Amino acid sequence: MIGPVVKIDPDDLPRRANIHYLGGKDYKELPSYLAGWDVALLPFARNESTRFISPTKTPEYLAAGCPVVSTSIQDVVRPYGKGGLVHIADTPAEFVAAIEAALNEDEESRIVQVDAFLAQTSWDRTWGRMAELIEDVLETKRDSSRLMAAQGRAVSAANVASCFVTGD
């Protein structure tokens, strides 16, 4: 396991001969570790501290071509789990079954599906959509200002005309 142990007592972690807690690693080292994985695991504890996390590891592992198994963290389940991109498991038996399923997936079709999904959710695409929304709001505001200014002129002209008609 790579990464810090936080919000859980290290003594509560499972201890087995094939489980190694390596702590945090420099980002430059991570691809070397990832290259040796058959399946990427996201075994987050499910508690109030993890209820609203959105692990960036999920798209990173998917982009690296690894099948992923995660506990049912809300931002992993939706969209990755519901989209069939990540296997979701919460019990030891579910994790074993999910890992076996991940190992038996057709790698080529999984990668095609993942690539298509990630292309729709890239930072460039997200920023482009945000910029469009901002521009739409600004354009609406400009149109509204023009309309209000035009209405103001119309009201002023009507007031002037009314003064002439009524003699006020």
Spans of model-derived segments:
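CheY-like receiver
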Residues: 33, 98-101, 129, 133
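Conserved acidic donor-binding segment of nucleotide-sugar-dependent glycosyltransferases
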Residues: 85-93, 100-106
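Short, hydrophobic beta-strand segments that form beta-sheet elements in well-ordered domains
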Residues: 1-6, 68-71
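Nucleotide-sugar-dependent
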Residues: 26-33, 40-63, 69-81
